[in-house]
Amino acid sequence: MRHVFIVNKFSLNKKLDTISERIKEVCKELKIYYVIETITKDNLMKDALKKYLNSKNIIIAVGGDGTVNRILNNIMGSENYLGVIPVGTGNDFYKSILKQNTEMYEKIDVAQINDKYFINIACFGIDADVGNNTKIIKNKLIPIKQRYNVSLIYTFFKYKNKEAEFTSKEEKQQGKFTTIVIANGMYYGGGFQIAPNSKYNDGLLDVYYAKDMKKYKLPGLIIKIKKGTHEQSKSINKFQTTEITIKLKEETVCNIDGDEITDTNFKIKLLPQAITLYNNQELIKKVLG
């Protein structure tokens, strides 16, 4: 089957030529029929993928979680498989794949939020604001991989809890929330293990929420989330569902796998076994060296 490598120039920066050459070398070694599409602007992603939608290919994101998300949103409904070469900043989707010992070919769940899709995590509240503010912090003196931590500190001082309500068959809540997280995968924020027991093929979304937390309690909770031990915390509530509706008092940013959408109403539902994951560890390890 043809392998289509979608290379995100912005994820690679100076490594673009090196990674592209490695892909060519490895594909020749493994006798893989391949095409490389280099994306220089986000709005060119759709055009690059359009010619592959009416045939069956393996579409491989060469980038981070944002690249995976944009490819997913363009190939849903087609017969294409989805793969990833993790060369982005966070690579949380790939971390989840490794932790779950995913097969080389495996049908996995996808979630739909309004008219978009996500494969890993959607979050509202302080988590989403941290992710959004990371893109604002463009000081070149701060290494890219440290900008999330800088944003975490910046957001800590600026953040105000969100007025919201959510409804599912399993639970209904309203009030002020510090965070609401809907997890299909396990990690977000570059290695924070928000949903340590989540599975891509269990047919369920894991929902976590914290109501109106005081700021002095946040550092301790963040440390627990990093370790994946927060499920025992009294500040965090969890349940599982297949569908949830969230309404917010004001327009609010929702972070979905490194991208953002803004609205006051969000309907999220699970689409079981909606896409085939291609997890060729030999290919990935050889390309990454």
Positions of predicted regions on the chain:
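ATP/NTP phosphate-donor binding region
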Residues: M1-I59, N69, G77, E171-K172, ...
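Catalytic core of DAGKc-family lipid kinases
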Residues: I6, E37, E79-T178
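Short conserved active-site loop signatures built around small residues
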Residues: D65, I180
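Short glycine/serine/threonine-rich phosphate/pyrophosphate-binding segments
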Residues: G66-R70, D92
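Glycine-rich phosphate/pyrophosphate-binding beta-alpha loops
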Residues: C123, D127, V181-I194, E260
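Gly/Ser/Thr-rich active-site loops/lids in small-molecule metabolic enzymes
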Residues: K138-Q146, P196-Y216
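A generic structural signal for short beta-strands and their flanking turns/coil linkers
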Residues: K160-K162, K176-T178, N201-D206, Q240-I244
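ATP/nucleoside-binding phosphotransfer catalytic cores, i.e., glycine-rich phosphate-binding loops
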Residues: S168, Q174, K199, A210-G289
